[in-house]
């Protein structure tokens, strides 16, 4: 196990040394994400003073109002990842189609990302974050992004909260790095994170319960209440999942009568978070199958999401159809 205090770049290089045939490309790719995260963190911290709060006056491909900080974060991610030359193509939640990199025309990897998850909470200073998912390149077109989640080679998120934390998996466990602004580095603060086998917190927007399409889910939530569970729901997936990862329990965003396929995006949110949770010892499901087994049909596909501790997800599956 890596020692606390190790900086993220050194950690990435140490992991690379465990694989003698590694080219170093994935290491450079992750370092590019780290650089972008530092800049986004700086913008988030100064948002109230730099006129980047509020809406940008546009609607994205998801049909959502684009926040100014959304747009800025997307630009930062695109600039750093394209400039790195380590990605053949990039898919952003904010863009209709993937962006193909001239510098990365021979690159081995593709990346899907949500530049700023939870952006509707920006104006009220709630924790928000960046989510990313990396796959091996398997072709020249859209098929690169239509791979099952279990084929990810790396996934992670950066949460911008009371501190900035970079949570990463490369398929060998999960580690968390806290940003130290005094030295300008992410330092290992949470080595080998394991989600508790069982928690006492559930995270779901019960205000939508009257719209849920599965009565079993209502019974399941009632069962958790009977067992003394606490409800905690922020409305920022990064923040809610981060708490679930550390404390255990269940995070859910089900389908409802308005969003019959769910609301969260498979590529940019569901699959990377499910991969992280699995690497930490947890489970995920759409209610019908493991999220990591879903083969995307579209880069903006949505799915119902339930992720968390094994105990809670196993119990959930006993209730829902």
From Swiss-Prot:
Subcellular location: Cytoplasm
GO MF term list: fructose 1,6-bisphosphate 1-phosphatase activity; magnesium ion binding
Binding site for Mg(2+) 2: 114, 117, 269
Pathway annotation: Carbohydrate biosynthesis; gluconeogenesis
Membrane-crossing segments per the record: none
Keywords for the protein's UniProt record, in alphabetical order: Carbohydrate metabolism, Cytoplasm, Hydrolase, Magnesium, Metal-binding
Lineage, opening ranks: Bacteria, Pseudomonadati, Aquificota, Aquificia, Aquificales
InterPro entries: FBPase_C_dom (IPR044015), FBPase_class-1 (IPR000146), FBPase_N (IPR033391), FBPtase (IPR028343), Fructose_bisphosphatase_AS (IPR020548)
Enzymatic reactions: beta-D-fructose 1,6-bisphosphate + H2O = beta-D-fructose 6-phosphate + phosphate
Binding site for substrate: 117-120, 205, 233, 263
Complex and partners: Homotetramer.
A GO CC term assigned to this protein in UniProt: cytosol
GO biological processes: fructose 1,6-bisphosphate metabolic process; fructose 6-phosphate metabolic process; fructose metabolic process; gluconeogenesis; sucrose biosynthetic process
Sequence positions that bind Mg(2+) 1: 93, 114, 116
Family stated for the protein in its record: Belongs to the FBPase class 1 family.
Stated name of the protein: Fructose-1,6-bisphosphatase class 1
HAMAP family: FBPase_class1
Coiled coil: none
Disulfide bond entries: none
EC number(s) given by UniProt: 3.1.3.11
Co-factor note (free text): Binds 2 magnesium ions per subunit.
Cofactor or coenzyme needed: Mg(2+)
Gene3D superfamilies in UniProt: 3.40.190.80, Fructose-1,6-Bisphosphatase, subunit A, domain 1 (3.30.540.10)
NCBIfam families: PRK09293.1-1 (NF006778), PRK09293.1-3 (NF006779)
